[in-house]
Structures are given as structure tokens and as C-alpha cells.
Regions:
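Internal acidic/polar
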Residues: 6-7, 96-125
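Short amphipathic alpha-helical boundary/capping segments
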Residues: 12-16, 134-143
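Sigma70-family region 2
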Residues: 18-19, 45, 58-73
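Short helix-capping/turn signature of helix-turn-helix
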Residues: 31-34, 42-45, 132, 151-158
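Structural recognition of an alpha-helix C-terminal capping motif at a helix-to-coil junction
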Residues: 38, 52-59, 72-84
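Arg/Lys-rich amphipathic alpha helix in sigma70-family domain 2
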Residues: 66-70, 83-101, 180
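DNA-recognition helix of helix-turn-helix
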Residues: 76, 87, 134-138, 146, ...
Length: 193
């Protein structure tokens, strides 16, 4: 019932934002900024990149509001945009590092500067138990195609159908990736325990 009210509110805000109401768009941002940040942070494990994804997501939402199909859930549409931006960043992030710290072909840049930082906050370390930490590390090490579905399924509590809608893939593909993702996790965690 609350989901229906939220959908109605979102639909109303989208209609107003399409007409140029900046306050309505600001409310959309308020409704989703934390959700998109958590999704992006779980997928990218980098606070700064997650913040960039949030900004890019809302920029794309604003530019493409006229393309949003009101027969679909707004949350699915915005999660798809955020997820796709994360996937794009993960693809671009493929490591291409030299074993040597100093690289002669790039002035002033050494190999250490190219390694992405791990910007986890102290409160994150306090909140995460040892077991959760191991699971999180195992999820981080998953290949991107499994990591995405595992984050959406287990950390964002999305149904298989919702994940299918967000990633624009058949439900059977999502089921397969969830199953294989679980197998990867099981094998990684068995080695650690």
C-alpha cells in the first residue's frame, strides 16, 4: 500500500518536473539520492565514484524525463540508469598497471597514483562484523556481471523480475547469474573459513 502511494507521488513529481517545476525535481532527488548512492557505493566500493554516479544519474534523469514511460515503475527506471553508469565505470576501471611504480612514458605520474583508493569511512569498519566483512570482500571480487546481480538481489532486496527490468535482461539470465554468483561466493568463503 505504501509502495502504491510512493508510485503515485513519484508519478506526480515526474509530471511536474516535466513541466519545468524545479522543486518537484528536487523532491525526486531527495527521494532517491541516498538509494542511488548506496547502490553505487556497493558496486564501486569508492565513495567519490559513487558520488559522481549519483550526480550523473540525476543529470541523465533530468535530461531524459520526457523518455520515461509512466506505465513502468520510476524506481526501476532510475535504478537502471544508476546501475548502467556503475557498470560503465567498472568496465573502464579494468586495471592496466605496470609492476614498476615509476613509468617513464607519463610525466609526473607513477604507478601508485593509478591505483584506485579505498575510501571507506571509519564508521563502515565499526558497523561491519568480521563475517559481513568477509562476505563483502567476496562480493567485491566477483566478476562484474555477477557482482551487479548479487548487489541488486541481496543488498538492494530486488526481486528477480525487478533486476530483469533494471538490467534489461531475461529473468532466466538473472536466475543463472544469481546462481553462479552464489557459487562463486560459496567457493571463496569456504577457502576463508
Amino acid at each position: 500500500m505504501e509502495g502504491d502511494r510512493l508510485d503515485t507521488l513519484e508519478q506526480r513529481l515526474v509530471r511536474l518536473a516535466r513541466k519545468g517545476d524545479t522543486r518537484a525535481f528536487a523532491e525526486i532527488v531527495d527521494l532517491y539520492k541516498d538509494k542511488i548512492f548506496h547502490l553505487a557505493y556497493r558496486m564501486l566500493s569508492n565513495r567519490h565514484e559513487a558520488e559522481d554516479v549519483v550526480q550523473d544519474t540525476f543529470l541523465r534523469v533530468y535530461r531524459n524525463l520526457d523518455r520515461y514511460d509512466e506505465t513502468q515503475k520510476f524506481s526501476t527506471w532510475i535504478y537502471r540508469i544508476g546501475t548502467n553508469l556503475c557498470i560503465d565505470r567498472l568496465r573502464k576501471r579494468k586495471p592496466n598497471y605496470s609492476l614498476d611504480a615509476e613509468m617513464n612514458d607519463q610525466e609526473g605520474i607513477d604507478g601508485y597514483a593509478m591505483i584506485p583508493s579505498d575510501d571507506r569511512t571509519p564508521e563502515t569498519y565499526l558497523l561491519v562484523s568480521e563475517t559481513q566483512k568477509m562476505v563483502h570482500e567476496a562480493i567485491e571480487s566477483l566478476p562484474a556481471k555477477y557482482k551487479t546481480v548479487m548487489v541488486l538481489r541481496y543488498l538492494k532486496d530486488m526481486s528477480l523480475q525487478e533486476i530483469s527490468d533494471v538490467l534489461d535482461m531475461p529473468v532466466t539470465t538473472i536466475k543463472t547469474r544469481v546462481h553462479r554468483g552464489r557459487e562463486f561466493l560459496r567457493k571463496k568463503l569456504e577457502r576463508k573459513i
